């Protein structure tokens, strides 16, 4: 008695279809599907820069060759 059976859901669905009409429900479903698709594409675009940043990250255990172009004296480094 506490939970709704399949018959309750079918009656609710029938009433909703009668109130809104099938064309309006179809439009709402299409809009909802487009919104979900746009959300998924946005999530993929948001994850792309993070993946690129991980690829550009320097290796932690490897040596990195660098070349200094100009030496600047630090404060307290007098000769």
From Swiss-Prot:
TM ranges: 1-21
Compositional bias per record (Basic and acidic residues), positions renumbered to this chain: 66-79
Stretches assigned to coiled coil: none
GO biological process per UniProt: protein transport by the Tat complex
InterPro entries per the UniProt record, alphabetical: TatA/B/E (IPR003369), TatA/E (IPR006312)
Cellular component GO terms, alphabetical: TAT protein transport complex
Keyword annotations from UniProtKB, A to Z: Cell inner membrane, Cell membrane, Membrane, Protein transport, Translocation, Transmembrane, Transmembrane helix, Transport
Pfam families the record matches: TatA_B_E
UniProt GO MF annotations: protein transmembrane transporter activity
Membrane topology value: Single-pass membrane protein
Subcellular location: Cell inner membrane
Region (Disordered): 46-79
Predominant location: membrane
Cited HAMAP family: TatA_E
PANTHER family named among the record's database cross-references: SEC-INDEPENDENT PROTEIN TRANSLOCASE PROTEIN TATA
Record text on subunit structure and interactions: The Tat system comprises two distinct complexes: a TatABC complex, containing multiple copies of TatA, TatB and TatC subunits, and a separate TatA complex, containing only TatA subunits. Substrates initially bind to the TatABC complex, which probably triggers association of the separate TatA complex to form the active translocon.
Function: Part of the twin-arginine translocation (Tat) system that transports large folded proteins containing a characteristic twin-arginine motif in their signal peptide across membranes. TatA could form the protein-conducting channel of the Tat system.
Protein's UniProt name: Sec-independent protein translocase protein TatA
Source species: Paraburkholderia phytofirmans (strain DSM 17436 / LMG 22146 / PsJN) (Burkholderia phytofirmans)
Record lineage: Bacteria, Pseudomonadati, Pseudomonadota, Betaproteobacteria, Burkholderiales
